[in-house]
């Protein structure tokens, strides 16, 4: 039974990774799961210098999910390389580093700093909805996406994945722009912009006012967008958005995703990623499927 999948020449032992920002770099989760079991680990967003993130409160629960406005808090790329990448080197698991920035220059600085490191792929975060500078401002303009990709590809040594925002009129236009700019793969969806009001205090539940919504409630939207993008471009896709179990993951794969990312479920169940992998393998055995690749985009 073959569970290997390939994105931009990089082969994953299985089609399951973690969604950026929900798993750190795996340090805490390594106490619960064998990180060697994962197809890949996608790290939290990394910028050129430390980012403090947004003011608190910055997380709120919703029906079927959560809102977050963390603001891509991180220690900066130098500390990330020294601490996080050093930790990840001990595992036989592919490493995808999520790159964020407030300007094209900052994206380039991070990409150049990582060019000689043990990183398999870069995920360009141009779609975080709760960072006022960069990120989402770039991800909603197809011309800007193509321009950023063209610039990043001049400096990147690793294949580049572009993470797409669902907060657009037509996500396929953004996907086409990323493809035209030279992207090697796409990941989608990032979180949907949402809001919650604390009626007792007559105030916003999150200091940032709005936050990114994730969790099971967004899954039907995410599956639909993966299907649309898979039929609009020729790039491989990492699908995500509300995956809780193997059945959810298989929906994304059948819609056209080569790899799936488990996100918010990690906060509820630290074993979620491994359980998704085991569930996919069980589905393949039960249905006598010899190659996971036969399921990718099988629903037309």
UniProtKB/Swiss-Prot annotation:
Record's catalysed reaction(s): (S)-dihydroorotate + NAD(+) = orotate + NADH + H(+)
Location of the active site: 128 (nucleophile)
Name of the top EC class for this enzyme: oxidoreductase
GO cellular component: cytoplasm
GO BP, sorted A to Z: 'de novo' pyrimidine nucleobase biosynthetic process; 'de novo' UMP biosynthetic process
Chief location category: cytoplasm
EC number assigned by the record: 1.3.1.14
Annotated metabolic or biological route of this protein: Pyrimidine metabolism; UMP biosynthesis via de novo pathway; orotate from (S)-dihydroorotate (NAD(+) route): step 1/1
Superkingdom, taxonomy of origin: Bacteria
CDD domains for this protein: DHOD_1B_like
Keyword Heme: no
Gene3D superfamilies: Aldolase class I
Family: Belongs to the dihydroorotate dehydrogenase family. Type 1 subfamily.
Function, in words: Catalyzes the conversion of dihydroorotate to orotate with NAD(+) as electron acceptor.
Protein name as it appears in the record: Dihydroorotate dehydrogenase B (NAD(+)), catalytic subunit
